[in-house]
């Protein structure tokens, strides 16, 4: 029995050790530093610790997998990936990422070189694009620079594809895959070479937009890429900005998510908040319908699907909601019965035969 207790104690200590986040920043004075984390596109404080002799240790067991970072005095910070493993990173300023050394962490042995590679290629592409911007399309060098830019973009695509293919199951691979664009095939044509559907590219892209996102990996919501994709999906470039269209695809998207996941929490919350604050007339319909479906209803246990909302907040969110839903676009409003201007006859709203009513002063 004593032997078993020693074994279990050893395994427990090993598990705790395996989730430590050890970071070293050369020439950094002793100070208070912060571990920061993403939820969607926003950064939040995750933990606080004292850095001594340029070194700091955080307890990773307190954190959820995703992209996190070390926040230093002077608004300086650098990011890395946490996925329930021990991390040992060392770096120095002023360019923390360029000087980053991964001493321990399988995820960051993929992530840090990837970030460095992408940063390098972006710099090269930016320089070529700047040169090309000074030329006219008919200039010979214009086409040459375009070819060089295409070649660099191809290098990035190959790097990303290899990283994803060679590292199945790694969180970094899923993050990279999520960031890659869907490849749209050539549209079908008839025997004479005419397009069968002029909207084929858009329809295909829209239908396959989320193909590169693993919705079963909840950690993907803990970085800004998912948030940016969600915002673009519901934006004017992808979707008609009509309240009924937004509601249709919002319901379809959110209903397909795990209702206990943080991805569900973020998506439902973001959609409701975004259209609740919209200054576009009619978009309040999206907000009220989201409240009705995901906040102000009860499951079999009597709980709201919005598990992240404090109980004392539901009264404000749901108060008089049914009446509010009767005032939105496309819904027949409650009948009003009022005296006419002579104050002798009662007129009800539903009996008006005009297509529009006009109030003249």
Predicted regions and their residues:
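Bacterial Sec-dependent N-terminal signal peptides
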Residues: 1-24
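A non-transmembrane, solvent-exposed segment enriched in polar/low-complexity residues
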Residues: 19-168, 175-210, 216
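Amphipathic alpha-helical repeat scaffolds of TPR domains
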Residues: 170-178, 227-228, 264-270
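A recognition module on extended beta-rich or small alphabeta surfaces enriched in W/G with H and D/E
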Residues: 194-243
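A cross-family structural signal marking well-folded subdomains
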Residues: 243-302
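Non-catalytic accessory segments flanking enzyme active sites
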Residues: 282-328
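N-terminal "domain-start" segment that seeds a small globular fold
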Residues: 308-356
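Conserved small/polar residues in nucleotide/adenosyl-binding loops
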Residues: 361
């Amino acid at each position: 029995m004593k032997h078993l207790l020693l074994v279990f104690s050893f395994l427990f200590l090993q598990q705790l050790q395996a989730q430590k986040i050890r970071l070293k920043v050369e020439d950094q004075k002793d100070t208070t530093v912060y571990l920061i984390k993403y939820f969607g596109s926003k950064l939040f404080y995750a933990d606080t610790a004292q850095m001594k002799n340029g070194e700091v240790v955080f307890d990773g067991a307190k954190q959820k997998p995703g992209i996190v970072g070390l926040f230093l005095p002077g608004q300086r910070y650098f990011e890395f990936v946490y996925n329930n493993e021990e991390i040992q990173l060392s770096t120095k300023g002023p360019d923390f990422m360029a000087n980053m050394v991964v001493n321990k962490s399988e995820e960051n042995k993929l992530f840090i070189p990837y970030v460095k590679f992408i940063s390098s290629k972006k710099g090269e592409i930016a320089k070529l694009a700047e040169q090309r911007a000074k030329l006219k399309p008919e200039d010979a060098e214009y086409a040459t620079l375009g070819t060089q830019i295409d070649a660099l973009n191809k290098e990035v695509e190959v790097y990303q594809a290899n990283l994803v293919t060679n590292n199945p199951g790694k969180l970094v691979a899923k993050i990279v895959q999520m960031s890659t664009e869907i490849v749209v095939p050539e549209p079908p044509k008839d025997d004479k070479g005419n397009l069968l559907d002029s909207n084929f590219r858009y329809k295909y892209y829209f239908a396959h937009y989320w193909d590169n996102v693993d919705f079963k990996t909840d950690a993907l919501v803990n970085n800004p890429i998912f948030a940016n994709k969600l915002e673009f999906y519901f934006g004017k470039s992808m979707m008609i900005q009509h309240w009924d269209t937004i509601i249709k695809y919002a319901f379809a998207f959110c209903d397909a998510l795990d209702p206990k996941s943080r991805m569900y929490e973020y998506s439902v919350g973001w959609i409701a908040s975004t259209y609740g604050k919209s200054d576009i007339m009619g978009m309040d319909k999206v907000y009220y319908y989201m409240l009705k479906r995901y906040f102000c209803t009860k499951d079999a246990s009597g709980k709201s699907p919005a598990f992240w909302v404090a109980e004392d907040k539901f009264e404000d969110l749901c108060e008089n909601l049914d009446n509010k839903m009767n005032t939105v676009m496309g819904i027949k409003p409650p009948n009003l019965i009022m005296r006419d201007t002579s104050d002798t006859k009662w007129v009800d709203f539903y009996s008006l035969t005009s297509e529009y009513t006009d109030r003249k002063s």
